[in-house]
Structure formats: C-alpha cells, structure tokens
Curated annotation (Swiss-Prot):
Catalyzed reactions per annotation: (6R)-5,10-methylene-5,6,7,8-tetrahydrofolate + NADP(+) = (6R)-5,10-methenyltetrahydrofolate + NADPH; (6R)-5,10-methenyltetrahydrofolate + H2O = (6R)-10-formyltetrahydrofolate + H(+)
Oligomeric and partner information: Homodimer.
Assigned keywords, A-Z: Amino-acid biosynthesis, Histidine biosynthesis, Hydrolase, Methionine biosynthesis, Multifunctional enzyme, NADP, One-carbon metabolism, Oxidoreductase, Purine biosynthesis
EC number(s) from the headed UniProt entry: 1.5.1.5, 3.5.4.9
Family named by the database record: Belongs to the tetrahydrofolate dehydrogenase/cyclohydrolase family.
Pfam annotation, one family: THF_DHG_CYH_C
Domain of life: Bacteria
Protein's name according to its UniProt entry: Bifunctional protein FolD
Pathway note: One-carbon metabolism; tetrahydrofolate interconversion
C-alpha cells in the first residue's frame, strides 16, 4: 500500500499557484475570489474560513460576504450580479447549502459561467460532458491531479464510481472517460455492488456511508479514492472506505482526513487563477 498524500500535493500546488499569482500581479492583474455565505451553518463557516485562508496565503484578493439567513433570494441574486459585472472578481463561490426559501438552481444559474469556480453552472456541466470543459467541479478535478501526480494509468482501465451527485459522481465519471477509462457509475440502488467493485482497477467512493467498503469489496492492487467524510459517535472522522482494512489490498489509497479534502480547496484556487489568466489574455 502506498498513501496518496493529498495534503502534501495541495501544499505543492499552492506554492506553484503563488508563483503564478505573483506573475499576474506584476501585470497588474490580481486574481479575485468572492465567497458568499448565507446563514450560520457551522460546517459552512469552517469551509468558508478555510477557503479564505488559502486564498490569502497564495496572494489572491479574497472577499467573504456573510449574509443573514433571512436575506431574500433577490438580494442574493443582486449581489451575485454585482460580482458578475466587476472585473475585480474572477471567481464567485456561493457556499451550499442555502436556506429553504432560496432556490439553489436560480443561484447557480445566476453566476457567470466564466466565474463559476465550483463548476456547478449547467453550462459548465454541459461543456464537461461535451468533452470541452471550462470550469470543473473541484473535488473530481483534484482527484485527477492526484492521478497525474502518482502516475496512475487510466487508459483502458476499469473504473467504478460509487455515487451519482452533480458535485462528485457524475463529473468524476466523465473525467475518467475523457482519460479513456471504462467507467461504471454505481449508487445506493445498485444491486450486487461487490461484483462491480471487485473488478475495478480504480475505485472512487463518494456515497456518504461510513466505512461501507471493506477489503473483500476491493480488487487486489486497485487504486482507491475515498471522498467520504463521516463522523462517528465520538466525533472522529472516517471515510466511505474502511481504511484499516482496505490499505492492505489497495496499491494506492487516500486517507480521511488528509486525502481528497485538501485538494478540493486547492482546485478552487487553481480555477480562480486560471480564470484571471484567461481574462488577461482576452484583454490583450
């Protein structure tokens, strides 16, 4: 078993991003990331704080707007439009989930696709599925960086993705197909799941079930990517994969924490920097 160290890879990428940001600043082009948080959800506050901290660390111009849970949908849409129109901001991120009275679909549609660093706008989803991506959801994008860093051969390999969300499962499957893997998407209703997972050269698990994947579910020598984040009764964090069991079967495996999580935030920063570079080239 070899560990895929997401924390170390994220730190390496952050150092490279800082160099790129410094070069953009020399050309009077400071990449800007605007983050909007609605309400007081504790987990969302932690995520936003981590994003803002990393943005500052690599030299981005970062703005965090905290809105009360009572903010109207129209007020939020108006704020997004202000960021859309401003050349100061190259990335816009609205932290999910949103209060029930605000339509998540309307909010995601309101963000300029070229500033949609989360990659959730339908136009960006469509571009990804057409094989011509602009912005890619950050967790799958981070996983692909892991594959590159650790020289994981994907072409012709059998990949199984457990989970079919728009945030991880579906875009992950498409990125694997673009890398010429043969991909199966499984989910909570899939029958005989073990028959699929035992055949997988690459297994990506993003289903939100604490340690559901055991050693007997995994092919010897498989690459296992664990996207899950589940807390047990003692508050300890676990993935969707039983790490202690599966590490003895897998050739490569991500831990939880310290695997996929650090890469997710780093890819948000990377897409913001790329958006700023793209805008600068357009203005030449």
């Amino acid at each position: 078993m070899n560990l895929i160290d997401g924390k170390a890879l994220a730190a390496k990428m952050q150092a490279e991003l800082k160099v790129k940001v410094d070069k953009l600043k020399e050309a009077d082009n400071v990449p800007g990331l605007a983050v909007i948080l609605v309400g007081e959800d504790p987990a969302s506050q932690i995520y936003v704080r981590n994003k803002a901290r990393q943005a500052t660390a690599i030299g981005l111009n970062s703005s965090v707007v905290r809105l009360p849970e009572t903010v109207s949908e129209q007020e939020l849409l108006d704020l997004i439009e202000q960021y859309n129109q401003s050349e100061q901001w190259h990335g816009i991120l609205v932290q999910l989930p949103l209060p029930e009275h605000i339509s998540e679909e309307k909010v995601l549609l309101a963000i300029d696709p070229e500033k949609d660093v989360d990659g959730f706008h339908p136009m960006n989803m469509g571009r990804l599925w057409s094989g011509n991506p602009l912005m890619i959801p950050s967790t799958p994008a981070g996983i692909m960086e892991m594959f590159r860093e650790y020289d994981v051969e994907l072409s012709g390999k059998r990949a199984v993705v457990i989970g079919r969300s728009n945030i991880v499962g579906k875009p992950m499957a498409q990125l694997l197909m673009m890398a010429d893997a043969t991909v199966t998407i499984a989910h909570s209703k899939t029958e005989n799941l073990r028959e699929l997972t035992k055949e997988a050269d690459v297994l990506v698990v993003a289903i939100g079930r604490d340690r559901m994947i055991k050693a007997e579910d995994v092919k010897e020598g498989a690459v296992v990517i664990d996207v899950g984040m589940n807390r047990d009764e003692d508050g300890k964090l676990h993935g969707d994969v039983d790490f202690d069991e599966v590490k003895d079967v897998a050739s490569l495996i991500t831990p939880v924490p310290g695997g996929v999580g650090p890469m997710t935030i780093t890819m948000l920063m990377e897409q913001t920097v790329r958006a700023a570079s793209r805008k600068m080239n357009e203005n030449k």
